[in-house]
Amino acid sequence: MSWLTDRLRLLAGLIAVAALAAPSLDVWAQQGDAPKKPAQQAQQQQKPPAKPRPAPTKPGQSIASKTEALPPSQIGIGTLAKQAFMVDPQTSTVLLFKDADKPMHPSSMAKMMTIYIVFEELAAGRLKLDTKFRVSERARNMGGSRMFVELGSEVSVEDLIKGMIVLSGNDACVVVAEGLSGTEESFAERMTKKAKELGMTGSVFKNSSGWPAEGQWTTARDLAVLAWRTIDDFPQYYKYYSETNWIYNNIKQDNRNRLLRTTAGTDGLKTGHTEEGGYGQATSAIRDGRRLILVVNGMTSMAERAQETSRVMEWGFREFTNTTVFRAGDTVAEAPVWLGTQDKVPLVVPRMVQVTAPTGQAVSPRVIAKYDGPLPAPIAKGTKLGVAAVTLPDGRVIEYPLEAGADVPRKGVLGRVTAMIGHYLFGWWS
């Protein structure tokens, strides 16, 4: 009967703790999980080490991972581009890969990074759309495509954004670079640093406009990463990329992105051209809520660039579809709760979870909910509690956050003591 005596002593101790030191019990319940039984601890220690698995990534992040994987069907398409990269950013599925990690000249597609930094400054409140920058002689004398800013004039940030996007103004880029960093050289260093932060490991910038310069490189994949981060990070400013023409200084110019006028759903981003690198374009289009991003480079003419970009984009929408695994707010699993008024809490996805596969192919992704449980109460609705690991058709694992789908208050003192007594007295057989 010694075990019973020990249990009764423990019972008396717990009651004393509840009566005299309830606040301490509250803190313990918030900071830790429910106590494990000795038998469980022994079993856990005897388990062999798990086999290493590929590290999972978050949606969007795996666009930058060095993979050439296509969906299992290996549906392919030839392209005239020297470099090409197409991705569904919402599922991180690569649909087309051709020398996408090979260094290439960024040309005017480098302006996307200058614009990204401007958007970042606006979102942080360090800039306003009506903030004005003065035009230097260096900016005024820039060659190539221009906004036609006048020496000594002051131009608003909003006009400079349109000048960089719609008019592809090299002069506008220099005005921005000098306004934000003092010199274009310093701004280029900032561009390269930001590229590394975004996962653009193959990009080095030497100026703000993409003007040919020794040692300036990017990759098709890197530009796709930048395109997606622009769309996802700054939806309130991305609208500028869809403007088809603009008048500045009494000069009307059309956006060089012809797909804005010819290909359904196109809403950005940027074209580019250098003698050595050829004609290139980073394009994004959305149809029925599904977005594709395509980067091509090395075309021989503006016409070929427009035709090839449109053809490949149509192929991507036609040959692949997205299957919804979970809608926003759907419950993926229920997790046990320790010392809560409810025994379980629903784990929900805050955003839609989809899988990309060839059109007509049945999709049955494997989904595993990961969390550390039991989860200690109280739990507030919307609190991140774990992840849903979704295995895609190409074998990659993407992790989506799981949040509490409901509030779970903590039990009162008597309820907590009762739960703890039950755990210690009867946990052996539970």
Segments the model singles out, each with a brief description of its role:
Residues 201-204, 212-430:
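Domain-terminus/edge residues, biased toward the C-terminal soluble/receptor-binding domains
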Residues 1-12:
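Bacterial N-terminal signal peptides that target proteins for export
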Residues 32-221, 228-234, 245-249:
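Active-site-adjacent loops and short helices of periplasmic peptidoglycan-processing enzymes
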Residues 18-27:
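C-terminal segment of classical bacterial N-terminal signal peptides
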